UniProtKB/Swiss-Prot annotation:
Residues 65-81 have a biased composition (Gly residues). One of its GO terms (molecular function) is DNA-binding transcription factor activity, RNA polymerase II-specific. Gene3D superfamilies: Homeodomain-like (1.10.10.60). It comes from Mus musculus (Mouse). This is Homeobox protein GBX-1. Its main location: nucleus. Residues 316-375 bind DNA. Keywords: DNA-binding, Homeobox, Nucleus, Transcription, Transcription regulation.
Length: 418
């Protein structure tokens, strides 16, 4: 391997690595060992590239994985300690592979407790975030025994890293400029008291490393809660349904709303308004054959359109799907025949009504929920008064009727004036 990394330690196992380092500092960086604790320097020099390239990938990996192969170190002292000797950590990275490995380095967490002062640990992460391609290729190269364990960790880290930059809040929460104190605390607690002890004795073997790797790679996953909120595109199941549930059937019914108003179906509209606000799809309330209800209910559905309700992520939810009265009529007929659809039936209905299969599926889900509520007796029979809760709900039709009502008022006023 390159001479400067290996020459300083001729004897087989003279001293523990940290003492050996202070005794024989590396020729090209004549500074004492404590230097590894200096923040900027330690951070700016990736331990991975230094170790991996100077010691040569073969020997370093062999040593870290095997933990004991005495001869495998190519002349430097055998055994596990040699891979982590501080001279290899401090020396400037060799020009050829330094950059490539460096981008991968921050994600290479197992060594964080070893190399960096706790306070600075999180700081390297932002530096490594943008260039992901090298990291991916790096992950490809980790197939040897050395990183068998890490290999599985890396892809998830890649995923995390890709997601991290687009957060709205976290960068500050995670590593803000005043990160040092908080980060020191969190990292210390995260990687348990051990790493402090482990840092004092430079000798680690792979068995020790693996727990560290698990420890240090586990903490990052807290972000995922944000993902489904920040990126609604991610399929967080509950969310998809809820938003679709709220978004099902409405404004298309609005025109129907006006005619329903003229029909003056007071009890009906009140009931189905309550239902739809309770989250049901509010198609027909009682026995289906009474088809008059389906245009009406479209409208009543239109009334509780989600007005600026915000999801946890802070985005206002998308508008509810507008079903036309014809679509509602067909869906009701289908539901009357069959409460549960097969996949083929669902795709046929969706195709016939020019809806997506998801819309049909969710309409049926909501309709079944309402049907079960009715069966359970929550809803009074269609003819009876709404016994459930005598709360008076006046559905305000959203769209045309505003103008109609206004003109009626004007006419009444004009009629009242003379």
């Amino acid at each position: 391997m390159s001479p400067e990394g290996d020459t300083p330690n001729p004897p087989a196992r003279p001293l523990p690595p940290y003492e050996r380092e202070s005794a024989a500092p590396e020729p090209h960086c004549a500074e004492p060992a404590p230097r590894r604790h200096l923040g900027p320097r330690a951070r700016s020099e990736p331990c991975v590239s230094a170790r991996g390239a100077r010691r040569g990938p073969g020997s370093a990996m062999q040593r870290a994985a095997g933990g004991g192969a005495p001869g495998g170190s190519g002349g430097s002292s055998g055994g596990p300690g040699a891979a982590f000797s501080i001279d290899s950590l401090i020396g400037p990275p060799p020009p050829r592979s330094g950059h490539l490995l460096y981008t991968g380095y921050p994600m290479f967490m197992p060594y964080r407790p070893l190399v960096l002062p706790q306070a600075l640990a999180p700081a390297p992460l932002p530096a490594g975030l943008p260039p992901l391609a090298p990291l991916a290729s790096f992950a490809g190269r980790l197939s040897n025994t050395f990183c068998a364990g890490l290999g599985q960790a890396v892809p998830s880290m890649v995923a995390l890293t890709t997601a991290l930059p687009s957060f709205a809040e976290p960068p500050d929460a995670y590593y803000g400029p005043p990160e040092l104190a908080a980060a020191a605390a969190s990292t210390a607690s995260r990687s348990n008291p051990e790493p402090a002890a482990r840092r004092t004795d430079g000798a680690l073997d792979a068995e020790e490393l693996l727990p560290a790797r698990e420890k240090v790679t586990e903490p990052p996953p807290p972000p995922p809660p944000h993902f489904s909120e920040t990126f609604p595109s991610l399929p967080a199941e509950g969310k998809v349904y809820s938003s679709d549930e709220e978004k099902l059937e409405p404004p298309a019914g609005d025109p129907a709303g006006s005619e329903q108003e003229e029909e003056g179906s007071g009890g009906d509209s009140e009931d189905s308004f309550l239902d739809s606000s309770a989250g049901g799809p509010g198609a027909l309330l009682g026995p289906k054959p009474k088809l008059k209800g389906s245009p009406g209910t479209g409208a009543e559905e239109g009334t509780p359109v989600a007005t600026g309700v915000t999801t946890p992520g802070g985005k206002s939810r998308r508008r509810r799907t507008a079903f036309t009265s014809e679509q509602l009529l067909e869906l009701e007929k289908e539901f009357h025949c069959k409460k549960y659809l097969s996949l083929t039936e669902r795709s046929q209905i969706a195709h016939a009504l020019k809806l997506s299969e998801v819309q049909v599926k969710i309409w049926f889900q909501n309709r079944r929920a309402k049907w079960k509520r009715i069966k359970a007796g929550n809803v009074s029979s269609r003819s009876g008064e709404p016994v459930r809760n005598p709360k008076i709900v006046v559905p305000i039709p959203v769209h045309v009727n505003r103008f109609a009502v206004r003109s009626q008022h004007q006419q009444m006023e004009q009629g009242a004036r003379p």
